[in-house]
Structures are given as C-alpha cells and as structure tokens.
A protein has these predicted regions:
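Interfacial segments of multi-pass membrane proteins
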Residues: 98-102, 323-333, 337, 344-348
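Short, non-helical or kinked segments that cap or interrupt transmembrane helices
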Residues: 81-95, 142-150, 198-203, 314-322, ...
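Membrane-embedded alpha-helical modules
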Residues: 112-219, 340-390
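Flexible hinge motifs at transmembrane-helix junctions and intramembrane kinks/re-entrant loops
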Residues: 53-57, 173-174, 182-260, 265-275, ...
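N-terminal signal-anchor module of multipass membrane proteins
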Residues: 1-84, 95-108
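Hydrophobic alpha-helical transmembrane segments of multi-pass membrane proteins
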Residues: 28-35, 145, 149, 170, ...
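Intrinsically disordered, low-complexity non-transmembrane regions of multi-pass membrane transporters
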Residues: 1-25, 221-247, 283-286
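Membrane-embedded helical hairpins/re-entrant loop segments and their flanking transmembrane helices
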Residues: 20, 46-79, 260-335
Length: 390
C-alpha cells in the first residue's frame, strides 16, 4: 500500500479530526458543493414524473434526495470504502428513468404510479450492484486496470461534467465568471491571508457571488426574467418541517423492461465510481484503493441505491465527483468532515425552509462552481500519468 498523505500537503488528512466548529463549517461546504447536482436531478425529473405543476410535492422529493444522500454517505464513510466521499444522486440514471416515465402504459396515470415503477427498477438494479460488489467481480477486474486506464477515465469524467456546469454559468457569464474567479482567488492566491479563506474557498465564493447577485436584484438591475435574479418566493412558500419515510409514494412496481433499462445506468455509475475512488484517495492522502476497498465501496453504493429506491428519490446514489474536487481545492481530506456533512444533509432534509433558501442561489453561480470543481477533477485524473513508466 502507498500512503499519499505526505505528498498532498493536506491541512487535514483522512483520519484527522478538525475542531468541532471547523468540522461543521467544512461539512456545510460539502453540502453546498453537492447541493446543485442533487437539486438538479428532481428538477429535471419533474416534467417526466408529472410534478411540474406540484411545487409542494416537488419540494418533498428534493428533501428526500438530501435525506437519503446523508444516510448513504454515512454508511459509505463508516462501513463502506471509508473514503471521504459524498454519496448522492447520479445523472447516469436520468435517461433510463425518463424512458420508464415515458412508457405507453404510464401515459395517463398519476405521478405516484410513475414513481413506483422507477422505484421498482432502482431496487431491482441495486440487488445487481450489491451482488457485483459482494462476489468481488468488480475487484477482480482491477488487475487489468492501471494508471494509464484510470487517468483518462477520471479526466473524461471531469470533462464530461462540463456539459452541466458550463451551460449554467453561460446563462450569465458575468456572475458565473465571477464565481470561477473567486474560487481560484480564494483557493490559490488569497489562502495565505486568513485561515478561513484557506479552509472555505468554495463557500466564500458562493456567498460573495450570491451577495452580488442579490444587490443587483435589489437595485433593479436584474429583473425577474434574468438568470441571476435572486428571489425569496420559494422560501416564503415552503413548509417548515417534513420527515421523509420509506414507501411514502406507495408500493414499488417491478417490471423486466424497466429493470433492463436501468442496468445501463448502474453499469455507468459503477465505472465512474471506481475512478472516483482513486481520485478521492489521491486527494485525501488515503492508501491507493485495493480490490477489497473497491468491492466494499460498490457493495455499499448498491445498498445506498436500495435505500433510495425504498424512500423514493426517483434516482440512485453514487460517488460525487464535485465533492472530490472540493477536497483538492480546500486540502481537507478528513473523513470526519464528510460525515459531518452527511449529518447536515439528514437534518436539513427535514427542514424544508433551509433547502428552499438555497434554491434561491442563481444558476450561473452554481454553474461557475461546477466549472472550477470539474477542472480540478480533470487535473487529478491527468496527474495519475506520473505513475506510468514510459
């Protein structure tokens, strides 16, 4: 095993335990980093599911996503691969989910019935993923996977994700670009000024850009139709508390066609997660993942997908690349910090008002943050080439 902690110049390594206040704030930063992707998934699925005119139910679905993400992140970091890796919804499941919702048999049914069929496919697929992990089939393939394979995989994950970040930032480049510039300034050039800047570059960049957008909204520069317009309407309309619970949308429905379609999403998720494990281990100073670590990670991702199916998130769970990028920018690879972030996800998943507050972050800011995150992921992937003996 090779421990990479000495080479990373980390502020906190994987087993380090920062002070309580720092742990909570850094955990909140992880929550904010994964917020955009997690929020985007139910918003994208709202039309196929039939929730576009049901803001209350859509809010419940969003809260369920965060609640389940917190549970699965705790499971993965405590008993799974034990890397400081955040678990959350995956874009790999979007295409098969949309296809399931579009089946002719579901054309004239309520959104709950569509959700039940999606849940059934996700639960069935999770059994497949758990089996792959428990039997060690994924780990056995690792003997054929080296740095020259991992490097382009991780780099392509980062590059592929730009299609989600760049268009969002591009809706208003002044604010999106400001977010990117602030993240670069805080993480690379101003980090020696104050320790808080060094620890929270992403959070500070989001808050600063958000404040700028809010000021221009108040001054009337950004009107309601403007991409950077900041409105508190969602916050006013949201209820205070609601605790998600299993089978809240009804009993899952199982079908062969839906299961087979969802398998494609699972395979893509597994391949992406293996690359994420290597990137996360490298950035957090952990040992290079071995066959056992990979098997446990995939097993617990399958368990996470099973939980997501039972609760009805309309999606599965996988490793979040953007949070791995956050580790690189903050140089904080502590497992405890990610676990704190998971607890925050669970708690705030029951507080509808808090989640509604962050829906007021303009999309250009979220897109700008993604561009910086995905750039870091791409760089980490290419850095694996240093281990290739040419």
């Amino acid at each position: 095993m090779v421990n990479q902690n000495k080479n990373n110049n980390l502020l906190y390594g994987i087993d380090d335990k920062p002070p309580m206040v720092e742990t909570v704030v850094l955990g909140l930063q992880h929550y904010l980093t994964m917020f955009g992707s997690t929020l985007a998934i139910p918003l994208i699925l709202s039309k196929p599911l039939g929730l576009e005119d049901k803001p209350v139910e859509l809010g419940w679905l969003i809260a369920t996503m965060f609640f389940v993400s917190g549970i699965t992140t705790l499971l993965q970091t405590t008993w799974g691969n034990r890397l400081p890796i955040v678990q959350g919804g995956t874009f790999s499941f979007l295409a098969p989910t949309i296809a399931i919702c579009g089946m002719a048999a579901l054309n004239n049914v309520g959104w709950e019935v569509r959700m039940q069929h999606v849940q059934g496919a996700i639960i069935a697929g999770s059994v497949f993923e758990i089996g792959i992990g428990v039997t060690g089939l994924v780990g056995k393939l690792l003997r054929f996977v080296g740095p020259i394979t991992i490097a382009p995989t991780i780099a392509l994950i980062g590059l592929a994700l730009f299609k989600f970040g760049a268009p969002m930032a591009g809706t208003h480049w002044p604010i999106g670009g400001l977010t990117i510039i602030l993240i670069i300034l805080f993480s690379q050039y101003l980090k020696s000024w104050y320790r808080s800047i060094e620890l929270y570059p992403i959070l500070l960049a989001i808050l600063t850009a958000w404040a700028v957008a809010a000021i221009f909204t108040i001054l009337g520069v950004f009107t309601e139709s403007h991409p950077s317009f900041t409105s508190m309407e969602n916050l006013k309309n949201a209820p205070w508390f609601r605790v998600p619970y299993p089978l809240q949308w009804g009993i899952p429905q199982f079908g062969i066609a839906a299961f087979v379609g969802m398998l494609a999403g699972y395979i893509a998720s597994i391949v992406e997660s293996i690359g994420d494990y290597y990137a996360c281990a490298r950035l957090s100073g952990a040992e290079i993942p071995n066959e056992r670590t990979i098997n446990r990670g995939i097993t617990f991702e399958g368990i996470g997908c099973f939980i997501a199916g039972i609760f009805g998130t309309g999606n599965g769970t996988t490793s979040y690349s953007e949070n791995i990028g956050a580790i690189g920018l903050t140089r904080v690879g502590s497992r405890r910090v990610v676990q704190a972030g998971a607890i925050i996800m669970i708690l705030l998943g029951t507080v509808s008002k808090f989640g509604a507050l962050f829906t007021t972050i303009p999309s250009p800011i979220v897109g700008g943050m993604y561009c910086a995150m995905f750039g870091m992921i791409t760089a980490v992937g290419l850095s694996n080439l240093q281990f290739v003996d040419l």
